[in-house]
Amino acid sequence: MAKESMKAREVKRQKLVKKYAEKRAALKEAGDYEGLQKLPKNSSPVRLHNRCKLTGRPKGYMRQFGLSRVMFREMANQGLIPGVKKASW
């Protein structure tokens, strides 16, 4: 499991990206690169990293479910994810 501080840091980045998205788009459109540089570093969407909602694991992230592969498998086997069942052929 990821440290709580890492999860919190990622949430903080997401809030900053959302807050400055409109301003960032306007500055980009105007070509004001100095203005862009004055914005906080973490307000750039490039700095976001997908993490598992339950464990905070940064690797093996399944975008469709918002979970890491480990948690996805566990929850799917328990039948906690609607519409997902084990393949058989």
From Swiss-Prot:
Metal-binding is among the record's keywords: no
Recorded GO MF terms: rRNA binding; structural constituent of ribosome
BP GO annotations: translation
Cellular-component GO terms for this entry: cytoplasm; small ribosomal subunit
Keyword annotations from UniProtKB, A to Z: Ribonucleoprotein, Ribosomal protein, RNA-binding, rRNA-binding
One family name in Pfam for this protein: Ribosomal_S14
Record bears the keyword Aminoacyl-tRNA synthetase: no
Family matches, as InterPro entries: Ribosomal_uS14, Ribosomal_uS14_bac/plastid, Ribosomal_uS14_CS, Ribosomal_uS14_sf
Chain residue ranges for the region called Disordered: 32-51
PANTHER family tied to this protein: 30S RIBOSOMAL PROTEIN S14, SMALL RIBOSOMAL SUBUNIT PROTEIN US14M
Membership in a protein family: Belongs to the universal ribosomal protein uS14 family.
Subunit structure: Part of the 30S ribosomal subunit. Contacts proteins S3 and S10.
Function in brief: Binds 16S rRNA, required for the assembly of 30S particles and may also be responsible for determining the conformation of the 16S rRNA at the A site.
Identification of the protein by name: Small ribosomal subunit protein uS14
Lineage of origin: Bacteria, Pseudomonadati, Bacteroidota, Flavobacteriia, Flavobacteriales
